[in-house]
């Protein structure tokens, strides 16, 4: 199958909107490949941290990305042959990832890498510019969001499960700062595409959201 004919579902949205969990489950339901684009920036950030490289050095971040040795195996993420699934989800790693994601040269470097994930029978991907920049011809584009309180509660639950204490108020402030940074960057800012379907997951269970996405995809395939 020609790559351009391979179906793609993109789920974009702010941090802690649930897009990663939903994208992974939808990909499993459809038997599609899965790309966690945010993990790529986290992996670059993690690699920089491990090498004690200054993340404010854009050239160094591009060089790290160019030689990045990563793989996604089921629900685990590997860097240089080591399972870094937990490390890459650490709050510090996420903060650094948000900073380096503003580097236009880095985004260009990772562009082709991400598009190479488009393989038969299909791809489900989540991020912040998947529908607007990486896969503008996607079969279905969804902008996933939720209230600040709901997103903070989800992040709090994730942290508590890892034994990390955090206050809801602090998490809301952190999410606001992250949203501002992601939405105001000059290159590929976080925004809803004109042709993306808005899906507010506030008050919905994971199963309900997955079901809605699958129904939306079925309708998109008919069009």
Curated annotation (Swiss-Prot):
Residues binding ATP, per UniProt: 13-21
Catalytic activity: CMP + ATP = CDP + ADP; dCMP + ATP = dCDP + ADP
GO cellular component, one term: cytosol
SUPFAM superfamilies, alphabetized: P-loop containing nucleoside triphosphate hydrolases
Domain of life: Bacteria
Cellular compartments annotated: Cytoplasm
Keywords tagged on the record: ATP-binding, Cytoplasm, Kinase, Nucleotide-binding, Transferase
MF term (GO), any: dCMP kinase activity
GO annotation, biological process: nucleobase-containing small molecule interconversion; pyrimidine nucleotide metabolic process
EC number: 2.7.4.25
HAMAP family: Cytidyl_kinase_type1
Similarity field: Belongs to the cytidylate kinase family. Type 1 subfamily.
PANTHER family: CYTIDYLATE KINASE, CYTIDYLATE KINASE/PANTOATE-BETA-ALANINE LIGASE
Protein name as catalogued: Cytidylate kinase
Species of the source: Nitrosomonas europaea (strain ATCC 19718 / CIP 103999 / KCTC 2705 / NBRC 14298)
């Amino acid at each position: 199958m020609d790559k351009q004919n391979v179906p793609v579902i993109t789920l974009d949205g702010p941090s802690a909107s649930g897009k990663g969990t939903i994208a992974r489950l939808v990909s499993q339901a459809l038997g599609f490949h899965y790309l966690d684009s945010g993990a790529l920036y986290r992996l670059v950030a993690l690699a920089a941290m491990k090498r004690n490289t200054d993340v404010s050095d854009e050239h160094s971040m591009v060089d790290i990305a160019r030689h990045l040795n990563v793989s996604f195996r089921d629900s685990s993420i590997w860097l240089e042959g080591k399972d870094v699934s937990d490390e890459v989800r650490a709050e510090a790693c996420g903060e650094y990832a948000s900073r380096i994601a503003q580097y236009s040269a880095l985004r260009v470097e990772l562009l082709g890498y991400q598009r190479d994930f488009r393989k038969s029978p299909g791809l489900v991907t989540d991020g912040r510019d998947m529908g607007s920049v990486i896969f503008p011809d996607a079969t279905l584009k969804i902008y996933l969001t939720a209230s600040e309180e709901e997103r903070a509660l989800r992040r709090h639950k994730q942290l508590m499960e890892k034994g990390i204490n955090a206050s809801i108020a602090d998490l809301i402030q952190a999410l606001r700062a992250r949203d501002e940074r992601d939405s105001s960057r000059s290159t590929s800012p976080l925004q809803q595409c004109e042709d993306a379907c808005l899906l507010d997951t506030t008050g919905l269970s994971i199963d309900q959201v997955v079901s809605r996405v699958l129904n939306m995809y079925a309708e998109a395939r008919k069009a």
